[in-house]
Amino acid sequence: MLEQVILFTIIMGFLISVLISPILIPFLRRLKFGQSIREEGPKSHMKKSGTPTMGGVMIIVSIAITAIVMTQKFSHLSAEMFLLLFVTIGYGLLGFLDDYIKVVMKRNLGLTSKQKLIGQIIIAIVFYGVYHYCHFSTGIRVPGTHLSIDLGWGYFILVLFMLVGGSNAVNLTDGLDGLLSGTAAIAFGAFAILAWNQSQYDVAIFSVAVVGAVLGFLVFNAHPAKVFMGDTGSLALGGAIVTVAILTKLEILLVIIGGVFVIETLSVILQVISFKTTGKRIFKMSPLHHHYELVGWSEWRVVVTFWTAGLLLAVLGIYIEVWL
């Protein structure tokens, strides 16, 4: 029965995304919700200017419908599922506002860093308020063991850091056709397996719903992309994967399973530190995927390489938790 629920969930998530896309993409094009390409980015990306963005709407709709329907068939809407949907939709709405400012109000940078940070923190605080009210654990568990370290109120700081940092890290990865869609599918697939192993079936169903939704989106987002997810999708996915890690008490393992997102973020941080302190850049451009483009790799080669790295890291994460 449970295996059938998981199978139907991924199929449903995939089909909803695939069926929504042919309706939403022309609609976005008619509204002229096209992506603006920053001039300081790789010159090869200029031809992508005008490609419909805000496609993350179809991902969020697919996730929400699939997760709610399949959870109701299996049991009921739990506190875990509520928190997962709240963060996903909340961060998605924040990303939608950012995208709207970029494409409609023609402010290429969207929300200011301060505005986006305030929005991310508010959502994180509400999340933690519900999390604390439901008496969920404030401890972090060492992967592969039963050892848990209770952080008390320090866990609140960790949650804020993870949700803000994690959503931004995933957002940074969304720079090439299909890059984030593929890496997100792999990472959520790994968490689905681990949640299932913990008998956290609601979290597993949600994670599989995300896998189906992003794979359906990937049909239209693979190179050459017909639509971009925008911050609408990337912030939603970032918030979602952090929430999954928190609910499964795999906060530490997120660094490995989401290793591609971590590496992308570190490349930006190191680039800034190096330039500020020495006046020299470590990479030709950051995030890291742009560096490989500028050394001559094709976009597709970069994407497949990052997918492969993400898959290897996901397998490593599962191995540490289940078999180590």
Swiss-Prot record:
Q: What class of enzyme is it?
A: transferase
Q: Which GO terms describe its molecular function?
A: metal ion binding; phospho-N-acetylmuramoyl-pentapeptide-transferase activity; UDP-N-acetylmuramoyl-L-alanyl-D-glutamyl-meso-2,6-diaminopimelyl-D-alanyl-D-alanine:undecaprenyl-phosphate transferase activity
Q: Keyword Manganese: yes or no?
A: no
TM regions (residue ranges):
5-25, 50-70, 77-97, 117-137, 147-167, 176-196, 203-223, 227-247, 250-270, 302-322
A family per Pfam: MraY_sig1
**Biological-process GO terms, alphabetical:** cell division; cell wall organization; peptidoglycan biosynthetic process; regulation of cell shape
The catalytic activity of this protein is classed by the Enzyme Commission as 2.7.8.13
The terms describing its cellular component in GO are: plasma membrane
Q: Which InterPro entries match?
A: Glycosyl_transferase_4, PNAcMuramoyl-5peptid_Trfase, PNAcMuramoyl-5peptid_Trfase_CS
> Which PROSITE patterns does the record associate with it?
MRAY_1 (PS01347), MRAY_2 (PS01348)
Annotated membrane topology: Multi-pass membrane protein
- State where the protein is found: Cell membrane
Q: Which CDD domains does the record associate with it?
A: GT_MraY
Q: In which pathway does it act?
A: Cell wall biogenesis; peptidoglycan biosynthesis
Cofactor(s) needed by this chain: Mg(2+)
List the keywords (alphabetical): Cell cycle, Cell division, Cell membrane, Cell shape, Cell wall biogenesis/degradation, Magnesium, Membrane, Metal-binding, Peptidoglycan synthesis, Transferase, Transmembrane, Transmembrane helix
Functionally, this protein is described as follows: Catalyzes the initial step of the lipid cycle reactions in the biosynthesis of the cell wall peptidoglycan: transfers peptidoglycan precursor phospho-MurNAc-pentapeptide from UDP-MurNAc-pentapeptide onto the lipid carrier undecaprenyl phosphate, yielding undecaprenyl-pyrophosphoryl-MurNAc-pentapeptide, known as lipid I.
The Swiss-Prot or TrEMBL record describes its family as follows:
Belongs to the glycosyltransferase 4 family. MraY subfamily.
UniProt xrefs under NCBIfam families: mraY
Which protein are we looking at? Answer: Phospho-N-acetylmuramoyl-pentapeptide-transferase
* Taxonomic source organism: Bacillus velezensis (strain DSM 23117 / BGSC 10A6 / LMG 26770 / FZB42) (Bacillus amyloliquefaciens subsp. plantarum)
Its taxonomic placement starts with: Bacteria, Bacillati, Bacillota, Bacilli, Bacillales
